Amino acid sequence: MVADSDGFRQLGADRLVSYAARRMTVLPIEFLRDSFPKLFARGMEVLENRAAAGDARAQRILDDVKGVTGAASLQIDDEPPVILSAQQGSLSAGDAPADQVPIRIMAALPGDALQLLLGEVAKAGALEDEEVAVGAAQTASKRFEDALAGRPMTCHITIADVPSLGNIDVRVGFNVSTLPAEPGFTTELRFPDLESVQRGELTVQDLFLGGKLKMEGDYSLALQIAMQLLTNPL
C-alpha cells in the first residue's frame, strides 16, 4: 500500500484528517488505529458511489485499491508499531498484520511533529472534504506494488521549514524486514513547495524535474517508478 501522486497531494499536512463520526483524534497512535481506517473506508464509499454513477476514473481507482494485499508497519517514536493491513479494498489496524497479509512497507515517524500537524488539521475542519477521504484510500495502490515488483527500497525523507516544527524526518522502507540505519537514498522537500503542490501551483513532475526535491544516494529505482506512474496516470 502506498499513496500515488494524487494521494500524496490530497493527504498533505493541511489535509490529513479522520472521518470518525465527525471527530478526529490528534494522538498519532489513536489516529492510525481508529481514525485513518475510517477515513479510508469513507474514501472507498465515495469512490463506489462515483463509479456507480458512471465515473470511469473512480472505477479505475477502485480496481487499483482493491488489488492490494499488503500491510504497512508504522512506528511512532519508540512505541510498538501500528500495522495497517489492506486487502480487497478494506483497511484494518492492529498489532500484527491480518492473516496472510505480508508487510510491504515500514516507516518510523516522529510523534511530537505528527501530533502537532494533526492538531492543525483538526482546527482546519477538513472533515467534509470527500477528496481527502479518496486520497486516504489511494494510499493502497496495486500499480505501485507492481512497479516496485518486490524490490527493496529504503529512504530517509526530510520535510524542511515546517512552521513551528522546523524539519521533520521520516524513515521509510519497502519490501524490507527492518529499517536500515543508512538508507538507499535521502530526499528533502521544503514545506512551502509541498503547499504549492496542494494548491495546484506545482505538480509532482515539477518537484522531480525542477530541482525541488534534493535527492542523494541511489534513487534510480524511485525515479523510475515515479516517472512510470506519473506518465501513465489512472
Sequence positions of predicted segments:
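Feature captures hydrophobic
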Residues: 2-234
